[in-house]
Amino acid sequence: MTNLMYIFCLIVWGLNFIAVKIQGTPVSLELSLTYRLVITAFLFIALVLFLKPKGKPTRKDIPFIMVFGICNFALSYLCLYYATILSSAAIVTLIFSLKVILTPLALRIFLKEQLHPRVLFGGVLGVVGVCVLIYPSLSSFSSLDVLKGILIALLGTVLTAIGDVSSARNARGKIDPIYSNAMGFTVGSILMSVIVLFQGQKIIIPTSITYISALLYLTLIASFLAWLFYLKLVERIGAAKSGYMVALFPVIGGIASVLIGESPLSIYLILGCLSSCIGAAIALGFRIPRRIKQM
């Protein structure tokens, strides 16, 4: 069961930005994200009411949970949505994998946690991987949108790292992650709703099969079920081993991007994904199991 949950999270989150690309822009990205966050918030609230887990947050924890929700679910998601539409899912997935380097850096800055040298070495390989993949786009003068997408993806990844700091602080306070997610998605959905209302957008729900199926995938599978399985994985095998899947996100996203015809199969894509995966694995402290070594 543990292996199935691991593979589920790996594939689902690796295809996250592919789903965003398929969903498209029949309505604004802000409105699409609002739908996703509102539905997910209701699902987690229902789960809280059903399970009533221990580890309730106190009043002093609320600001940190708000930062977690705003950074991880609202602003970072919005940035990554825009980046996916402007560039490609493969590029965004690759850039997002830099989270395994940016999060330890943020933890060092804000929570004074020790920064292992392997994070820096893995970070260099990760940056090299990103540079290799985006080189063809940067060498073309007609790819301003791609450049914007790359910069926005970097901003979204930085925001995620900041949100991870708040999440780490909440974990130290023994707050149950289900409470954090329920409140975080609620705060994120409220912020996005305010943005949509401020923009004066007409609230409509596209009825195309591609939009609805992508929305259901992003809410029920990628935001709700995957998070539940991930929390169970952390409980069973620890956060470090659970985090190894991030190292494979670029491969999943890259392969899917090629299969749907979004990105051409090129040496830049292969080398970029390979370098990023190796860098992420090093940063996470991945080790070859003893059984494999003996073989």
Give the predicted meaning of each segment.
Residues 44, 115-137, 192, 247, ...:
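Hydrophobic transmembrane alpha-helices of multi-pass small-molecule transport proteins
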Residues 23, 32, 36, 83, ...:
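Hydrophobic/aromatic residues within transmembrane alpha-helices
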Residues 1-31, 143-169, 188-191:
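Glycine-/small-residue-enriched transmembrane alpha-helix faces in small-molecule transporters
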Residues 12, 16-17, 45-96, 132, ...:
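Specific transmembrane alpha-helical segments of multi-pass solute transporters/efflux pumps
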Residues 33-35, 91-98, 166-189, 219-259:
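Helix-helix packing/entry segments at the starts of transmembrane helices
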Residues 26-75, 102-103, 159-166, 182-200, ...:
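Transmembrane alpha-helices of multi-pass small-molecule transport proteins
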Residues 1-2, 26-30, 34, 57-63, ...:
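Juxtamembrane helix-entry segments on the extracytoplasmic side of multipass membrane proteins
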